[in-house]
Amino acid sequence: MNRLALYCRQGFEKECAAEITAKAAELEVFGFARVKDNSGYVLFECYQPDDADRLAKEIPFRELIFARQILVVGELLRDLPPEDRVSPIVGMLIGVVDRGGELRVEVPDTNESKELLKFCRKLTVPLRTAMREQKVLMARENKTRPVVHVFFIAPGCCYVGYSFSNNNSPFYMGIPRLKFPSDAPSRSTLKLEEAFHVFIPADEWDERLASGMHAVDLGACPGGWTYQLVQRSMMVHAVDNGPMAPSLMDTGQVTHHRADGFRYEPSSSKIYWLVCDMVEKPAKVTSLMIQWLVKGWCREAIFNLKLPMKKRYEEVSQNLLAIKEALDTAGISSEIHAKQLYHDREEVTVHVRRMWSAVAGRRDERD
Protein backbone atom coordinates (compact mmCIF):
# COMPACT_ATOMS: atom_id res chain seq x y z
CA MET A 1 0.00 0.00 0.00
CA ASN A 2 1.86 3.02 -1.23
CA ARG A 3 -0.68 5.74 -1.84
CA LEU A 4 -2.75 8.12 0.23
CA ALA A 5 -6.44 8.81 -0.14
CA LEU A 6 -7.59 12.20 1.10
CA TYR A 7 -11.25 13.13 1.43
CA CYS A 8 -12.17 16.73 0.63
CA ARG A 9 -15.05 19.01 -0.22
CA GLN A 10 -16.43 18.44 -3.72
CA GLY A 11 -14.84 20.99 -6.06
CA PHE A 12 -11.70 21.47 -3.96
CA GLU A 13 -9.72 18.48 -5.24
CA LYS A 14 -7.01 20.63 -6.87
CA GLU A 15 -6.41 22.54 -3.64
CA CYS A 16 -6.21 19.30 -1.65
CA ALA A 17 -3.76 17.87 -4.21
CA ALA A 18 -1.54 20.97 -4.17
CA GLU A 19 -1.45 20.89 -0.39
CA ILE A 20 -0.54 17.22 0.03
CA THR A 21 2.13 17.53 -2.69
CA ALA A 22 3.69 20.47 -0.85
CA LYS A 23 3.50 18.79 2.57
CA ALA A 24 5.08 15.60 1.22
CA ALA A 25 7.90 17.56 -0.42
CA GLU A 26 8.67 19.22 2.92
CA LEU A 27 9.42 15.71 4.22
CA GLU A 28 11.39 14.91 1.05
CA VAL A 29 8.76 12.42 -0.04
CA PHE A 30 7.85 12.61 -3.69
CA GLY A 31 5.04 11.30 -5.82
CA PHE A 32 2.13 12.56 -7.86
CA ALA A 33 -1.51 13.38 -7.20
CA ARG A 34 -4.39 11.86 -9.14
CA VAL A 35 -7.26 14.32 -9.34
CA LYS A 36 -10.75 13.84 -10.70
CA ASP A 37 -12.82 17.02 -10.66
CA ASN A 38 -15.80 17.03 -8.28
CA SER A 39 -15.01 13.53 -7.02
CA GLY A 40 -14.66 14.55 -3.35
CA TYR A 41 -11.28 12.85 -2.91
CA VAL A 42 -7.65 12.89 -4.06
CA LEU A 43 -5.08 10.11 -4.42
CA PHE A 44 -1.37 10.74 -3.85
CA GLU A 45 0.88 7.97 -5.17
CA CYS A 46 4.36 7.77 -3.65
CA TYR A 47 7.42 6.73 -5.65
CA GLN A 48 9.12 4.84 -2.82
CA PRO A 49 7.78 1.86 -0.83
CA ASP A 50 6.42 2.66 2.65
CA ASP A 51 6.37 6.42 1.99
CA ALA A 52 2.58 6.58 2.20
CA ASP A 53 2.68 5.03 5.66
CA ARG A 54 5.33 7.55 6.69
CA LEU A 55 3.30 10.50 5.40
CA ALA A 56 0.17 9.31 7.21
CA LYS A 57 2.19 9.26 10.43
CA GLU A 58 4.35 12.36 10.04
CA ILE A 59 2.16 14.98 8.34
CA PRO A 60 0.13 16.40 11.25
CA PHE A 61 -3.48 15.96 10.18
CA ARG A 62 -4.54 19.14 11.94
CA GLU A 63 -2.16 21.09 9.69
CA LEU A 64 -3.98 19.99 6.53
CA ILE A 65 -6.44 22.66 5.43
CA PHE A 66 -8.43 21.00 2.66
CA ALA A 67 -8.31 17.31 3.69
CA ARG A 68 -11.15 15.92 5.80
CA GLN A 69 -9.39 12.58 6.23
CA ILE A 70 -6.05 10.99 5.34
CA LEU A 71 -5.50 7.25 4.96
CA VAL A 72 -3.10 4.76 3.40
CA VAL A 73 -4.65 2.64 0.64
CA GLY A 74 -3.66 0.03 -1.91
CA GLU A 75 -4.78 -0.64 -5.47
CA LEU A 76 -8.41 -0.08 -6.39
CA LEU A 77 -10.49 -3.22 -5.91
CA ARG A 78 -12.72 -3.45 -8.99
CA ASP A 79 -15.78 -5.50 -9.85
CA LEU A 80 -16.29 -7.07 -6.45
CA PRO A 81 -18.45 -10.18 -6.96
CA PRO A 82 -22.03 -9.53 -5.77
CA GLU A 83 -22.18 -12.97 -4.17
CA ASP A 84 -19.11 -12.29 -1.97
CA ARG A 85 -17.83 -8.74 -1.62
CA VAL A 86 -16.39 -9.40 1.82
CA SER A 87 -13.59 -11.89 1.07
CA PRO A 88 -11.56 -9.75 -1.40
CA ILE A 89 -11.71 -6.78 0.96
CA VAL A 90 -10.62 -8.73 4.02
CA GLY A 91 -7.95 -10.56 2.01
CA MET A 92 -6.32 -7.29 1.04
CA LEU A 93 -5.94 -6.32 4.70
CA ILE A 94 -4.55 -9.58 6.09
CA GLY A 95 -0.90 -8.98 6.93
CA VAL A 96 -1.33 -5.23 6.49
CA VAL A 97 -3.46 -4.29 9.49
CA ASP A 98 -3.21 -6.25 12.72
CA ARG A 99 -6.02 -5.82 15.25
CA GLY A 100 -7.39 -2.51 14.10
CA GLY A 101 -9.58 -0.64 16.53
CA GLU A 102 -12.47 0.44 14.32
CA LEU A 103 -14.03 -0.11 10.88
CA ARG A 104 -15.43 2.68 8.71
CA VAL A 105 -17.10 1.87 5.39
CA GLU A 106 -17.29 5.21 3.61
CA VAL A 107 -17.98 7.04 0.35
CA PRO A 108 -17.03 10.45 -1.07
CA ASP A 109 -19.25 13.32 0.09
CA THR A 110 -21.11 13.83 -3.20
CA ASN A 111 -24.75 13.67 -4.25
CA GLU A 112 -23.89 10.75 -6.52
CA SER A 113 -22.66 8.69 -3.56
CA LYS A 114 -25.79 8.95 -1.41
CA GLU A 115 -27.30 5.72 -2.71
CA LEU A 116 -23.93 4.01 -2.31
CA LEU A 117 -23.88 5.06 1.34
CA LYS A 118 -26.97 2.94 2.03
CA PHE A 119 -25.16 -0.10 0.65
CA CYS A 120 -22.10 0.66 2.81
CA ARG A 121 -24.20 0.62 5.95
CA LYS A 122 -25.54 -2.82 5.06
CA LEU A 123 -22.06 -4.15 4.31
CA THR A 124 -20.50 -2.89 7.54
CA VAL A 125 -21.77 -5.64 9.86
CA PRO A 126 -20.67 -8.68 7.78
CA LEU A 127 -17.36 -6.96 7.03
CA ARG A 128 -16.71 -6.27 10.70
CA THR A 129 -17.51 -9.87 11.61
CA ALA A 130 -15.14 -11.27 8.98
CA MET A 131 -12.35 -8.87 9.93
CA ARG A 132 -12.60 -9.86 13.57
CA GLU A 133 -12.40 -13.53 12.63
CA GLN A 134 -9.19 -12.84 10.68
CA LYS A 135 -7.75 -10.65 13.47
CA VAL A 136 -7.75 -7.62 11.16
CA LEU A 137 -10.00 -6.02 13.79
CA MET A 138 -10.00 -6.43 17.55
CA ALA A 139 -13.01 -8.06 19.15
CA ARG A 140 -14.05 -4.70 20.56
CA GLU A 141 -13.55 -1.15 19.34
CA ASN A 142 -10.36 0.47 20.56
CA LYS A 143 -9.77 4.18 19.92
CA THR A 144 -5.99 3.82 20.28
CA ARG A 145 -5.56 1.31 17.43
CA PRO A 146 -5.44 2.04 13.67
CA VAL A 147 -8.77 2.64 11.92
CA VAL A 148 -9.63 0.34 9.01
CA HIS A 149 -11.23 2.14 6.07
CA VAL A 150 -13.16 0.69 3.14
CA PHE A 151 -13.74 3.57 0.73
CA PHE A 152 -16.28 2.91 -2.05
CA ILE A 153 -16.02 5.26 -5.02
CA ALA A 154 -18.57 3.37 -7.15
CA PRO A 155 -20.71 0.21 -6.87
CA GLY A 156 -18.35 -2.75 -6.62
CA CYS A 157 -15.23 -0.54 -6.55
CA CYS A 158 -13.38 0.45 -3.39
CA TYR A 159 -10.05 1.37 -1.87
CA VAL A 160 -9.05 -0.47 1.29
CA GLY A 161 -6.62 0.84 3.86
CA TYR A 162 -6.02 2.36 7.27
CA SER A 163 -5.44 5.58 9.17
CA PHE A 164 -3.71 6.24 12.46
CA SER A 165 -6.05 7.05 15.34
CA ASN A 166 -3.65 9.66 16.73
CA ASN A 167 -3.36 11.49 13.39
CA ASN A 168 -6.71 11.37 11.62
CA SER A 169 -10.21 12.76 11.79
CA PRO A 170 -12.19 11.01 14.53
CA PHE A 171 -15.38 11.49 12.50
CA TYR A 172 -17.01 9.10 10.03
CA MET A 173 -16.17 10.38 6.50
CA GLY A 174 -14.31 13.19 8.26
CA ILE A 175 -17.61 14.96 8.94
CA PRO A 176 -18.83 15.88 12.44
CA ARG A 177 -22.56 15.25 12.82
CA LEU A 178 -24.01 18.44 14.27
CA LYS A 179 -27.68 19.24 14.69
CA PHE A 180 -28.94 22.69 13.76
CA PRO A 181 -30.45 24.31 16.89
CA SER A 182 -34.02 25.36 16.12
CA ASP A 183 -33.63 28.62 18.05
CA ALA A 184 -30.40 29.73 16.31
CA PRO A 185 -30.72 32.86 14.13
CA SER A 186 -28.93 31.32 11.11
CA ARG A 187 -27.31 28.12 9.89
CA SER A 188 -23.91 29.80 10.06
CA THR A 189 -23.97 28.90 13.76
CA LEU A 190 -22.86 25.38 12.77
CA LYS A 191 -19.58 26.75 11.35
CA LEU A 192 -18.47 28.05 14.73
CA GLU A 193 -19.69 24.96 16.58
CA GLU A 194 -17.73 22.75 14.18
CA ALA A 195 -14.69 25.02 14.56
CA PHE A 196 -14.77 24.50 18.33
CA HIS A 197 -14.81 20.71 17.80
CA VAL A 198 -11.96 20.84 15.27
CA PHE A 199 -9.64 23.37 16.89
CA ILE A 200 -10.23 23.05 20.65
CA PRO A 201 -9.47 19.68 22.32
CA ALA A 202 -12.51 18.40 24.19
CA ASP A 203 -10.63 18.24 27.50
CA GLU A 204 -9.82 21.98 27.22
CA TRP A 205 -13.35 23.25 26.59
CA ASP A 206 -14.02 24.00 30.26
CA GLU A 207 -10.93 26.22 30.36
CA ARG A 208 -10.95 27.85 26.91
CA LEU A 209 -14.71 28.05 26.29
CA ALA A 210 -15.62 28.87 29.86
CA SER A 211 -18.76 30.42 31.28
CA GLY A 212 -18.36 34.11 32.00
CA MET A 213 -15.72 34.78 29.35
CA HIS A 214 -15.92 37.97 27.30
CA ALA A 215 -16.05 37.77 23.50
CA VAL A 216 -16.41 40.00 20.45
CA ASP A 217 -18.28 39.00 17.28
CA LEU A 218 -17.39 41.24 14.31
CA GLY A 219 -20.05 41.32 11.60
CA ALA A 220 -22.41 39.56 13.97
CA CYS A 221 -25.84 40.15 12.37
CA PRO A 222 -28.19 38.29 12.76
CA GLY A 223 -26.22 36.38 15.40
CA GLY A 224 -25.39 32.86 14.24
CA TRP A 225 -21.91 32.95 15.76
CA THR A 226 -22.98 35.04 18.75
CA TYR A 227 -25.51 32.27 19.50
CA GLN A 228 -22.70 29.74 20.08
CA LEU A 229 -20.94 32.09 22.50
CA VAL A 230 -24.18 32.81 24.37
CA GLN A 231 -24.87 29.07 24.63
CA ARG A 232 -21.57 28.78 26.48
CA SER A 233 -22.65 31.53 28.89
CA MET A 234 -20.20 34.12 27.57
CA MET A 235 -20.72 37.88 27.58
CA VAL A 236 -20.67 39.03 23.95
CA HIS A 237 -20.04 42.35 22.22
CA ALA A 238 -21.86 41.95 18.89
CA VAL A 239 -20.59 44.44 16.31
CA ASP A 240 -22.75 45.08 13.22
CA ASN A 241 -24.79 47.89 11.71
CA GLY A 242 -27.57 45.39 11.05
CA PRO A 243 -30.15 44.06 13.55
CA MET A 244 -29.46 41.23 15.98
CA ALA A 245 -31.96 38.47 16.71
CA PRO A 246 -34.26 39.60 19.58
CA SER A 247 -33.89 36.16 21.20
CA LEU A 248 -30.17 36.83 21.70
CA MET A 249 -30.68 40.36 23.01
CA ASP A 250 -33.25 39.05 25.50
CA THR A 251 -30.60 36.87 27.19
CA GLY A 252 -28.92 39.92 28.70
CA GLN A 253 -25.55 38.50 27.61
CA VAL A 254 -25.22 40.51 24.39
CA THR A 255 -24.23 44.15 23.94
CA HIS A 256 -25.01 45.32 20.40
CA HIS A 257 -22.62 47.89 18.93
CA ARG A 258 -24.00 49.43 15.73
CA ALA A 259 -20.63 49.94 14.07
CA ASP A 260 -18.41 48.84 11.21
CA GLY A 261 -16.50 45.72 12.24
CA PHE A 262 -13.36 47.05 10.56
CA ARG A 263 -13.39 50.25 12.63
CA TYR A 264 -14.58 49.00 16.02
CA GLU A 265 -12.05 49.03 18.86
CA PRO A 266 -12.84 47.33 22.17
CA SER A 267 -13.09 49.42 25.32
CA SER A 268 -12.81 46.35 27.56
CA SER A 269 -9.49 44.71 28.39
CA LYS A 270 -11.22 41.44 29.30
CA ILE A 271 -11.84 40.11 25.78
CA TYR A 272 -10.71 36.49 25.43
CA TRP A 273 -12.44 35.42 22.19
CA LEU A 274 -12.70 37.22 18.86
CA VAL A 275 -14.89 35.65 16.16
CA CYS A 276 -15.55 37.02 12.69
CA ASP A 277 -17.50 35.81 9.65
CA MET A 278 -17.59 38.84 7.36
CA VAL A 279 -17.92 38.70 3.57
CA GLU A 280 -14.79 40.57 2.55
CA LYS A 281 -11.50 39.99 0.72
CA PRO A 282 -9.24 37.55 2.62
CA ALA A 283 -6.34 40.01 2.85
CA LYS A 284 -8.56 42.67 4.42
CA VAL A 285 -9.91 40.27 7.06
CA THR A 286 -6.39 38.97 7.72
CA SER A 287 -5.12 42.50 8.28
CA LEU A 288 -7.92 43.14 10.78
CA MET A 289 -7.19 39.93 12.68
CA ILE A 290 -3.49 40.79 12.82
CA GLN A 291 -4.39 44.16 14.37
CA TRP A 292 -6.46 42.52 17.12
CA LEU A 293 -3.87 39.86 17.88
CA VAL A 294 -0.80 42.09 17.83
CA LYS A 295 -2.46 44.74 20.00
CA GLY A 296 -3.50 42.06 22.48
CA TRP A 297 -7.21 42.86 22.17
CA CYS A 298 -8.02 39.13 22.31
CA ARG A 299 -6.34 35.87 23.27
CA GLU A 300 -7.92 33.52 20.72
CA ALA A 301 -9.59 34.20 17.39
CA ILE A 302 -11.69 32.16 14.97
CA PHE A 303 -12.51 33.74 11.63
CA ASN A 304 -13.43 32.87 8.06
CA LEU A 305 -11.53 33.75 4.91
CA LYS A 306 -13.68 33.85 1.77
CA LEU A 307 -11.78 32.30 -1.13
CA PRO A 308 -11.27 33.56 -4.69
CA MET A 309 -12.21 31.43 -7.69
CA LYS A 310 -8.58 30.63 -8.58
CA LYS A 311 -5.35 29.92 -6.67
CA ARG A 312 -7.28 29.25 -3.48
CA TYR A 313 -4.56 27.22 -1.77
CA GLU A 314 -1.99 29.93 -2.54
CA GLU A 315 -4.34 32.63 -1.21
CA VAL A 316 -4.87 30.83 2.08
CA SER A 317 -1.16 30.07 2.46
CA GLN A 318 -0.20 33.72 1.88
CA ASN A 319 -2.65 34.97 4.49
CA LEU A 320 -1.59 32.41 7.10
CA LEU A 321 2.04 33.33 6.49
CA ALA A 322 1.19 37.03 6.90
CA ILE A 323 -0.36 36.30 10.31
CA LYS A 324 2.63 34.24 11.45
CA GLU A 325 5.17 36.83 10.30
CA ALA A 326 3.28 39.69 11.97
CA LEU A 327 3.04 37.84 15.29
CA ASP A 328 6.67 36.73 15.11
CA THR A 329 7.79 40.29 14.41
CA ALA A 330 5.79 41.48 17.42
CA GLY A 331 7.46 38.84 19.60
CA ILE A 332 4.23 36.90 20.10
CA SER A 333 4.27 33.10 20.16
CA SER A 334 1.16 31.56 18.67
CA GLU A 335 -0.65 28.53 17.33
CA ILE A 336 -2.21 28.96 13.88
CA HIS A 337 -4.44 26.39 12.19
CA ALA A 338 -6.88 26.50 9.30
CA LYS A 339 -9.47 24.07 8.00
CA GLN A 340 -12.11 23.98 5.34
CA LEU A 341 -14.91 22.77 7.57
CA TYR A 342 -17.84 20.66 6.45
CA HIS A 343 -20.15 23.63 7.05
CA ASP A 344 -17.88 26.00 5.13
CA ARG A 345 -18.49 26.67 1.46
CA GLU A 346 -16.12 28.80 -0.65
CA GLU A 347 -14.12 29.62 2.48
CA VAL A 348 -11.80 28.30 5.15
CA THR A 349 -11.92 28.80 8.91
CA VAL A 350 -8.80 29.95 10.75
CA HIS A 351 -7.95 29.63 14.44
CA VAL A 352 -5.18 31.65 16.07
CA ARG A 353 -4.17 31.37 19.72
CA ARG A 354 -1.75 33.77 21.36
CA MET A 355 0.43 31.60 23.59
CA TRP A 356 2.79 34.04 25.30
CA SER A 357 4.95 37.04 24.57
CA ALA A 358 8.61 36.59 23.70
CA VAL A 359 9.28 40.25 24.53
CA ALA A 360 10.10 41.14 28.13
CA GLY A 361 7.46 43.30 29.70
CA ARG A 362 4.73 42.52 27.15
CA ARG A 363 1.57 41.16 28.73
CA ASP A 364 -0.47 38.52 26.99
CA GLU A 365 -3.03 37.56 29.62
CA ARG A 366 -5.65 40.29 29.85
CA ASP A 367 -6.83 41.66 33.17
From Swiss-Prot:
GO terms for molecular function: S-adenosylmethionine-dependent methyltransferase activity. The keyword 4Fe-4S does not apply. InterPro entries: RlmM_FDX, RlmM_THUMP-like, RNA_MeTrfase_FtsJ_dom, rRNA_MeTrfase_M, SAM-dependent_MTases_sf. Keywords: Cytoplasm, Methyltransferase, rRNA processing, S-adenosyl-L-methionine, Transferase. Its EC number is 2.1.1.186. The active site is at residue 306. Signal peptide: none annotated. Coiled coil: none annotated. It holds the Pfam family RLMM_N. S-adenosyl-L-methionine binds at residues 188, 221-224, 240, 260, 277. It is found in: Cytoplasm. GO terms for cellular component: cytoplasm. One of its GO terms (biological process) is rRNA processing. Its main location: cytoplasm. Monomer. NCBIfam families: PRK11760.1. Belongs to the class I-like SAM-binding methyltransferase superfamily. RNA methyltransferase RlmE family. RlmM subfamily. Catalyzes the 2'-O-methylation at nucleotide C2498 in 23S rRNA. This is Ribosomal RNA large subunit methyltransferase M. It comes from Serratia proteamaculans (strain 568). The lineage of its organism: Bacteria, Pseudomonadati, Pseudomonadota, Gammaproteobacteria, Enterobacterales.
